[in-house]
A protein has these predicted regions:
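Extended intrinsically disordered or low-complexity regions, especially N/C-terminal cytosolic tails and loops
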Residues: 1-148, 159-217
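Acidic/aromatic/glycine-rich contiguous surface patches that form carbohydrate-binding/processing clefts
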Residues: 155
């Protein structure tokens, strides 16, 4: 078996059966992740086109390396081509850069505690609890989606938890990027058996029945 799978890869699983279950799980959530990527890419394009005009993709400094790479392949450089070749990381970073989190996702009706019982849906600021603003929820959710996507597409074990029984899918939020004077860092995690729920909630938050149907293939 080590001729096919490395020892390091096998060591990440309790058994070969868990490896197979993980592959099945990744194949199940892939349509959800893919459709969320498409939505985020198009939503970003819509917002930045409204803000900066349709030429924004050609003028965005962070996309210069991608455009150069496409030119080297002698492809006809179009708006739609650049957009389609952007990685999820590039899309999310631009969403963060232009502070579009709360515009693109409305997560006010959703609670992070649903994905792990120790998650907090409040911030502690100068000793007082404050409910998470929507843009903070969206910021955290996008980081979690990015983590899930990267681990799934590198065939990492999404069914595994940490030795201390905390989720391996987790992201911190310190408030520094938003100039929020938090008393302590907030860490939000997703248990393996809640990953599907998390992705479904992101999809439902977009409030488009056709989009939901496409994501449940």
């Amino acid at each position: 078996m080590t001729l096919i799978l490395s020892k390091d890869r096998l060591a990440a699983y309790d058994s070969l059966e868990q490896y197979k279950e993980n592959l099945k799980f990744i194949s199940f959530i892939t349509p959800k992740i893919s459709n969320l990527e498409i939505y985020l890419r198009n939503a970003l394009d819509y917002c930045l086109t409204q803000m900066k005009g349709s030429e924004w993709v050609f003028n965005e400094n962070s996309l210069t390396p991608l455009i150069k790479e496409l030119k080297e392949k002698k492809k006809e450089i179009t708006h739609s081509l650049i957009l389609s070749k952007m990685s999820l990381g590039a899309v999310i970073n631009l969403i963060f850069c232009y502070k579009l989190e709360g515009v693109i996702l409305d997560l006010r009706a959703y609670r992070f505690r649903a994905y792990y019982h120790e998650n907090k849906d409040t911030l502690l600021i100068k000793g007082k609890k404050r409910l998470l603003y929507n843009y903070i929820k969206a910021h955290i959710a996008l980081n979690l989606l990015w983590t899930i996507r990267n681990r799934a597409y590198h065939w990492e074990n999404l069914l595994k938890i940490q030795p201390n029984n905390r989720p391996r899918i987790a992201t911190p939020f310190s408030g520094k990027t938003e100039n929020i004077p938090m008393d302590r860092i907030l860490v939000i995690g997703i248990e393996p058996n809640k990953i599907t729920l998390f992705l479904d909630d992101l999809i439902k938050s977009i409030e488009n029945k056709d989009f939901e149907d496409l994501s449940s293939l």
